[in-house]
């Protein structure tokens, strides 16, 4: 199973309106709070749909933003990146540092994602999860509804 699912109504956390959500990757589940100051939940879903469509089409990767703020006024964006390898999909949590991404726009988020690596510069293993392509396709199709 794979997906990012909203839970209930938006709430205020530390003075910011957020959408309680969770990401599910097979047996793993992590709570998320999607900020709603720049994007609403529809914007997130449209971005995921576009990014997944691109990644599935070119069989490389898709970046699913889970903390979108106005790019000119923020330093980084949290994402979950899906790397497609045949029937397997590897999922890593990723931060896009906007100062390193000249010309960043949310519409082209996949262009600012590097190829999958399994170890960082210090040789430490990068945390990642995996799921199957059909689970990602199910999530992709659910975004159209």
From Swiss-Prot:
Annotated protein name in UniProt: Immunity protein CdiI
Q: Which organism is it from?
A: Enterobacter cloacae subsp. cloacae (strain ATCC 13047 / DSM 30054 / NBRC 13535 / NCTC 10005 / WDCM 00083 / NCDC 279-56)
Q: Name one Pfam family in it.
A: CdiI_N
The record, for Gene3D superfamilies, names:
3.30.2450.20
Regions crossing the membrane? none
Describe what upregulates or represses it. Answer: Not expressed under laboratory conditions.
What InterPro entries is this protein classified in?
CDI_immunity_sf (IPR053755), CdiI_C (IPR040509)
> What sections of the sequence does the record tag as coiled-coil?
none
Q: What does this protein do?
A: Immunity protein component of a toxin-immunity protein module, which functions as a cellular contact-dependent growth inhibition (CDI) system. CDI modules allow bacteria to communicate with and inhibit the growth of closely related neighboring bacteria in a contact-dependent fashion. Protects cells against the 16S rRNase activity of CdiA-CT, its cognate toxin protein, but not against the toxic effects of a similar rRNase, non-cognate CdiA-CT from E.chrysanthemi strain EC16.
Q: How does it assemble?
A: Interacts with cognate toxin fragment CdiA-CT.
């Amino acid at each position: 199973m794979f997906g990012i699912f909203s839970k209930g109504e938006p709430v205020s956390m530390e003075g910011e309106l957020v959408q309680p959500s969770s990401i599910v990757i097979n047996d793993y589940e992590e709570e998320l709070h999607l900020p709603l100051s720049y994007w609403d939940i529809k914007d997130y879903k449209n971005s995921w749909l576009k990014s997944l469509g691109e990644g599935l089409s070119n069989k490389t990767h898709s970046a699913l933003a889970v903390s979108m703020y106005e790019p000119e006024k923020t330093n980084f964006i949290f994402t979950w990146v899906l790397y497609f390898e045949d029937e397997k999909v590897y999922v890593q949590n990723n931060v896009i540092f906007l100062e390193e991404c000249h010309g960043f726009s949310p519409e082209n988020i996949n262009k600012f994602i590097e190829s999958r690596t399994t170890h960082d510069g210090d040789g430490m293993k990068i945390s990642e999860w995996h799921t199957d392509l059909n689970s990602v396709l199910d999530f992709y199709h659910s975004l159209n509804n």
